[in-house]
Regions:
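Charge-dense, helix-prone N-terminal extensions
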Residues: 1-99
Length: 99
């Protein structure tokens, strides 16, 4: 409860909420980013999602990521998830142009 879920084409790309009075954000990353981020202070494999083999990271405490880094990772998450949509859905959403 109390979480905000952001989707593209019906697919989740980020989840925001609070944990111990700190903002918490969960987002999908590439395999390489997952390996780089998963052990950094303030970051961890996302509960539930990562345990199912998915490459999701949770930013849950300081120091974590800077605001700019967090925005970049959430943008990348949107891109990763939107690429997984059907071409028809991507065209519908204006993510790619019809050929």
């Amino acid at each position: 409860g109390g979480s905000h879920v952001w989707k593209v084409g019906g697919k989740v790309f980020a989840i925001g909420g609070w944990q111990d009075d700190e903002p918490s954000f969960t987002f999908k990353v590439t395999d390489i980013s997952y390996e780089m981020l998963k052990g950094q202070p303030g970051l961890r494999p996302a509960p539930y999602l990562a345990s199912r083999g998915m490459t999701w990271i949770q930013h849950f405490a300081k120091p974590g990521l800077s605001d700019d880094e967090l925005k970049d990772y959430i943008r990348q998450s949107h891109h990763i998830v939107s690429r997984g949509l059907s071409k028809k859905k991507q065209v519908e959403l204006g993510l790619i142009k019809r050929r």
